[in-house]
C-alpha cells in the first residue's frame, strides 16, 4: 500500500509539544502521504493560515484529507471553517455527533442538522462526511442506527467508517463496507485487540488488508490510535511499516 494518512488525534499530544510543522516532517519521513486534522472547534490552535498549511504540506508531499469537527464543540462560522479546509487543499469536513440515538425522531433531527451542513460544505467546494462511533451500531426497532442514518442523510454526505467502534459493537466490518460501498469515502484504520483495547495495526483482530479490499471506493485510509504500547512515535512508525507491506 503506497498511500495512507493519519488522524491528527493520534499525534496531537506530540504536535502540541514539538509544533505542527515538525510533526508533519516526521510523518512524511515515515511514509505517510496525508493527514486528517482534528480541530474540533476551529483552526485557531494551528496558528497558521490555510495557505501556510497547504504550503507546508505540499512541500512535504502530504495531502490534507480534511478536518474532524464535533457538533457539541464547534463555535463560529461553518462557512469560514469550510473555506479554510478548501483553501488548505482538503476535500472533506468530517462530523461526528457524541452521545446516543434514542428514537427514530432523534435520528431524523440529527440528520436534518447534518443535511444543512452538507449544503454549506458544497458551497465551499468540499464534501461532508459522517464519522461513526459505537452508538451508530446499536439496534433501534430492528435496524441499526447507521442504516437509519443512511436512509435519511442527503446522498451527497459520505461515511467515514471507523472499523474499531463498529467491530467493538459486533459488526462485521467487511460486510458493512461492501454494503455501503460508494458512500464510504474514508476509512479509519483503528485496531482492536481480543480484549477490546486499541492496539497497533499488526496486533489486533481486524484484518486491515481485508478492510481496504472491502472499501474500494474510499479515497483515503486513515490511521487512528488513542493508546500506545510504547510511544506515539513508535506506534506511528510500526503502523506505517505495516501498511507499506499490505
Predicted regions and their residues:
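N-terminal pre-domain/capping segments
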Residues: 1-88
Amino acid at each position: 500500500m503506497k498511500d495512507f494518512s493519519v488522524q491528527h488525534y493520534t499525534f496531537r499530544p506530540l504536535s502540541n509539544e514539538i509544533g505542527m510543522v515538525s510533526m508533519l516532517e516526521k510523518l512524511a519521513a515515515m511514509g505517510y502521504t496525508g493527514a486528517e486534522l482534528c480541530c474540533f472547534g476551529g483552526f485557531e490552535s494551528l496558528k497558521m493560515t490555510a495557505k501556510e498549511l497547504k504550503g507546508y504540506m505540499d512541500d512535504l508531499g502530504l495531502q490534507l484529507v480534511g478536518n474532524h469537527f464535533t457538533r457539541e464543540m464547534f463555535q463560529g462560522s461553518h462557512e469560514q471553517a469550510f473555506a479554510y479546509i478548501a483553501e488548505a487543499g482538503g476535500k472533506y469536513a468530517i462530523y461526528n455527533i457524541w452521545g446516543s440515538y434514542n428514537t427514530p425522531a432523534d435520528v431524523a433531527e440529527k440528520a436534518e442538522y447534518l443535511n444543512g451542513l452538507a449544503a454549506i460544505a458544497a458551497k465551499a467546494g468540499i464534501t461532508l462526511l459522517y464519522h461513526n462511533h459505537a452508538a451508530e451500531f446499536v439496534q433501534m426497532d430492528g435496524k441499526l442506527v447507521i442504516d437509519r442514518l443512511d436512509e435519511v442523510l442527503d446522498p451527497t454526505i459520505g461515511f467515514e467508517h471507523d472499523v474499531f467502534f463498529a467491530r467493538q459493537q459486533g459488526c462485521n466490518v467487511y460486510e458493512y463496507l461492501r454494503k455501503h460501498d460508494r458512500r464510504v469515502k474514508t476509512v479509519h484504520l483503528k485496531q482492536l485487540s481480543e480484549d477490546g483495547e486499541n492496539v497497533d495495526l499488526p496486533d489486533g483482530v481486524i484484518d486491515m488488508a481485508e478492510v481496504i479490499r472491502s472499501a474500494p471506493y474510499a479515497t483515503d485510509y486513515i490511521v487512528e490510535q488513542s493508546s500506545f504500547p510504547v510511544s506515539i512515535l513508535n506506534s506511528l512508525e510500526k503502523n506505517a511499516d505495516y501498511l507499506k507491506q499490505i
